[in-house]
UniProtKB/Swiss-Prot annotation:
This is NADH-quinone oxidoreductase subunit H. GO terms for molecular function: NADH dehydrogenase activity; oxidoreductase activity, acting on NAD(P)H, quinone or similar compound as acceptor; quinone binding. Signal peptide: none annotated. It is found in: Cell inner membrane. The keyword Hydrolase does not apply. The gene is nuoH. Its EC number is 7.1.1.-. GO terms for biological process: aerobic respiration. It catalyses: a quinone + NADH + 5 H(+)(in) = a quinol + NAD(+) + 4 H(+)(out).
């Protein structure tokens, strides 16, 4: 075992941490799908899934078994290679986007000095999965849904980047750990409230969640860009959407609500509680808000979110300049 040097041991520990964290994220995404159906049932005065296992607790397992054994059908005129590659790209990019989130001071999949830029890169890569899925399916509804999704995602990613810039300017770092440590005495949500508001709205839009789910509007597009997908390919898109929700919720906590900081309880517990709160908010938004028209969604972004983020960035720069004098 002479090859097992301290450096190799450190690398193995880092890889093991990353694998554990990413597996937990996938499990959290699957659990959220069950929690969403139960909470929507509660909000809408119905039962929700309650047949498989005690209180429906094994519904996730039943769904996984069903997806695994469903026919993996590919449309006759589809581009088979791109059609197969699209859900993999979407799932992997959304999963890797979580890698830069620090759960505790020592637990994170990747501690990068350009953590925020890495997240923006992975979020941008997910757009290709949607475009590939819509184009390769050779279906007009699928292509229209993909065009909607790509335009919406690219638009709202601009607002995400601008809302991050105020936090980066205050913390003087792109590193997520440095940003969390800068909130030890005051959370960023207080000086950066408009940045938080814009990021929360844009995060819902980028995840294609209600009320910004026009790319998948069942009444208009018959389920949008993944209309032709079935089996595990559809499962990757399905779980990937919930992984995106977990990632956005964790980023809200990290960037604006102090990350793992909190009194009395261990850092991991604080991070988990804060993230779970915002995941429930995603579900509550779906249960309570109507779906606007697509042109209203785009107009809201460019006419309201963009000026709001620019004003927030201008005010942040003015405060930093004043304090430096």
């Amino acid at each position: 075992m002479s090859w097992l040097t301290p450096e190799i041991i450190d690398v193995l520990i880092a890889v093991l941490k990353a694998v554990v964290i990413l597996v937990v994220v996938v499990v959290c995404g699957a659990l959220m799908s069950f929690g969403e159906r139960r909470l929507l049932g509660l909000f809408q005065n119905r039962y929700g899934p309650n047949r498989v296992g005690w209180g429906g607790s094994l519904q996730i397992v039943a769904d996984m078994i069903k997806m695994f054994f469903k026919e993996d059908w590919v449309p006759r005129f589809a581009d088979r290679m791109i059609f197969t590659l699209a859900p993999v790209i979407g799932f992997v990019s959304l999963l890797l986007a979580f890698a830069i989130v620090p759960i505790t001071p020592t637990w994170m999949a990747a501690d990068l000095n350009i953590g925020i830029l890495f997240f923006m890169m992975m979020a941008g890569l997910a757009v290709y999965a949607v475009l590939f899925a819509g184009w390769s399916s050779n279906n007009k509804y699928s292509l229209l849904g993909a065009m909607r999704a790509s335009a919406q995602t690219l638009s709202y990613e601009v607002f995400i980047g601008l809302s991050f810039m105020g936090v980066v300017a205050q913390a003087d770092s792109f590193n997520m750990v440095d940003i969390v440590n800068a909130q030890e005495h005051m959370w960023n949500v207080i000086p950066q409230f408009f940045g938080f508001l814009t990021f929360a709205i844009a995060g819902v839009a980028v995840c294609h969640r209600h009320p910004f789910d026009q790319p998948e509007a069942e009444q208009e597009l018959a389920d949008g860009y993944h209309i032709e997908y079935s089996g595990m390919k559809f499962g990757l898109f399905f779980v990937g959407e919930y992984i995106g929700i977990v990632t956005v919720s964790a980023l809200i906590v990290t960037m604006f609500f102090g990350g793992w900081h909190g009194p009395f309880l261990p850092p991991f517990v604080w991070f988990a509680l804060k993230t779970a709160f915002f995941m429930v908010m995603f579900i509550l938004i779906r249960a309570s808000l109507p779906r606007p028209r697509y042109d209203q969604v785009m107009a809201f972004g460019w006419k309201i979110c963009l000026p709001l983020t620019l004003l927030n960035l201008l005010a942040t720069a003015a405060v930093i300049l004043y304090n430096a004098q």
